[in-house]
Amino acid sequence: MDPFFLNTQHVELLVSGKQSSPQDLLGIVSESLNQDRIVLFRPGAETVFVELRGKIQQAESHHSGIFSLPVMKGISPQDYRVYHQNGLLAHDPYAFPLLWGEIDSFLFHEGTHQRIYERMGAIPCEIDGVPGVRFIVWAPHAQRVSVIGDFNGWHGLVNPLHKVSDQGVWELFVPGLTAGACYKWEMVTESGQVLIKSDPYGKFFGPPPWSVSVVIDDSYEWTDSEWLEERIKKTEGPMNIYEVHVGSWRWQEGQPLNYKELADQLALYCKQMHYTHVELLPVTEHPLNESWGYQTTGYYAPTSRYGSFEDLQYFIDTMHQHGIGVILDWVPGHFPIDSFAMSGFDGTPLYEYTRNPSPLHPHWHTYTFDYAKPEVCNFLLGSVLFWIDKMHVDGIRVDAVSSMLYLDYGRYAGEWVPNRYGGRENLDAIRFLQQFNTVIHEKYPGVLTFAEESTTFPKITVSVEEGGLGFDYKWNMGWMHDTLHYFEKDFPYRPYHQSDLTFPQWYAFSERFLLPFSHDEVVHGKRSLIGKMPGDAWRQFAQLRLLLGYQICQPGKKLLFMGGEFGQGREWSPGRELDWELLDISYHQGVHLCSQELNALYVQSPQLWQADHLPSSFRWVDFSDVRNGVVAYLRFADADAKKALLCVHHFGVGYFPHYLLPILPLESCDLLMNTDDTRFGGSGKGFREPEILTPEIARQEREAAGLIEADDESGPDCWGLDIELPPSATLIFSVTLQ
């Protein structure tokens, strides 16, 4: 009778590539009370040699690639190694214990495993004193999963994984492997189809279009402990974000700077320009350059386009050394259809949402995630925790939140299925986002979350305990749209669109807002910021300086996409660097200097950021001069403060040597910033010392200007402020109230 390991059914499954439990058949097996047997599977081999405690022995050859060697009882995995056909000597993968445990299984299938990035994928480790790589993957509908790579000739029968749970987790420890080893998954589906897949939990990948996963050794020595300890104290401070696409900020010798080259240059530039944070367009791995990173295939991997895993860690560490926070754009709303990645991962739509008639999102032709599956939510949650823990990022900006919240986003009637209450809200996505924010804020206080959300979905920045989603900030897309819509109007038409400026104040404090001028506004025919401005060159640059000043003064945190700070003329393209040579031209130099000084004023002025989410931080002065396009308001650090900033914006092209503003009683008024300064390329007007007028004098001035009739007694008289108002400019005054 053949020994059990030659059981025809077991061997047939192994040889045909459908064996889900190779660990039960291979490795060290007990044969009798006094003897064990080493059982090996080497498809295609004629002979196999084993080094057993220093002695080389030839294994017995059975049929179909099965070899065995009888050994004394109590042999351990460390006691023997096997010669491979390429001459290498390595320990037997099937002799080592499986480490995926019941707690791992419980947490993962519940969707709450907070260190899943240290369990799934390819994890270098040491088992029983033997170094190697442990491979674990979730593929519940596969008949067989193998790890293939340069270490086994990319042969799918050599290293099949063991199915460690009936819920589809597979595991194998491959001794002797080290960082740098390339691998993929080979799967046999329920229908018998063979699939080759990249690792969803892979920490690094070969350069596109080569989609191979790469084992990494995370051994970087961080030097930012002081930054991390102090990070929570910075959350209520100023936030002035510079949005950057790594591959097109600056080039050298015709190629983008890599992470390490970029680190010092960008950190120094941000310090010079008084930015507090950089926000990186996705640096998660992605196959298509033109997606800008927003079609992600490697949720746990920095893109290899700009350097290594460690290089990006160096970049973030360097930013922290210079006092600059790092925010990562992250895309949990959809993923690309590329067959090498997650789509149809184990032969079924494992990660995909399938309840709509078409699984593809109409906007991006991508798949949306199925948030009803705990394992999918754990995959996404693990991704963001990985970036915070292993890469030390300080904030996560969630892309396209609206597409997650609404089942009908981008779809017409009949193209979507309502939730169980008949509504259009994606209840599973809402629960995931609440879990996402809860876990991050509990586990990593001081790490901030941002929602790019373009609808009126309520309570985006309200705590989860109070029924909200729990984000720290929401991008104010309405403010951005209305502001740019106004600025694009030619000057004669602006009086008819004054509400574009005033309406956003009606909801400015309904959420904790961030005011963005992002990459999305300078592509696809929308023109650059300077290109949106009407008029001749002088007026365009004056308007851009005015716009930057307006953004700085408005309540909310700030974000500006790279190039806007010096008046980039062309639309942004990911395939070229910014037009830095424009800084040789005086107009662009002026905008650049103006932006620098506006940023400096912002970070030094608590009135502009300390309470910018509270109504008490903002008080209108005047927005009635629609014809001339003048608005003015006060900004306060707290409700009881006597010190305030008076912000005056003139959106027209006229010049007023004497312009009278109604104002609260003032003790003093000093000019801090004038975007019409000749140093910035302006006309140099607006520097006359402002005059504070008592109510009596202010009334006389208004009568003389024809603003009121002499016998008009409607309403109380107010104080006045007589200023010199330059064309198309922002003026910022420091005022002390009586």
Curated annotation (Swiss-Prot):
Alphabetized UniProt keyword annotations: Carbohydrate metabolism, Glycogen biosynthesis, Glycogen metabolism, Glycosyltransferase, Transferase
Name of the top EC class for this enzyme: transferase
Gene Ontology biological process: glycogen biosynthetic process
UniProt GO MF annotations: 1,4-alpha-glucan branching enzyme activity; cation binding; hydrolase activity, hydrolyzing O-glycosyl compounds
Signal peptide limits: none
EC number in record: 2.4.1.18
Catalysed reactions, as listed in the record: Transfers a segment of a (1->4)-alpha-D-glucan chain to a primary hydroxy group in a similar glucan chain
InterPro entries found in the cross-reference section: A-amylase/branching_C (IPR006048), Branching_enzy (IPR037439), GlgB (IPR006407), GlgB_N_E_set_prok (IPR044143), Glyco_hydro_13_cat_dom (IPR006047), Glyco_hydro_13_N (IPR004193), Glyco_hydro_b (IPR013780), Glycoside_hydrolase_SF (IPR017853)
Name of the protein: 1,4-alpha-glucan branching enzyme GlgB
Annotated source species: Chlamydia trachomatis serovar D (strain ATCC VR-885 / DSM 19411 / UW-3/Cx)
Gene that encodes the chain: glgB
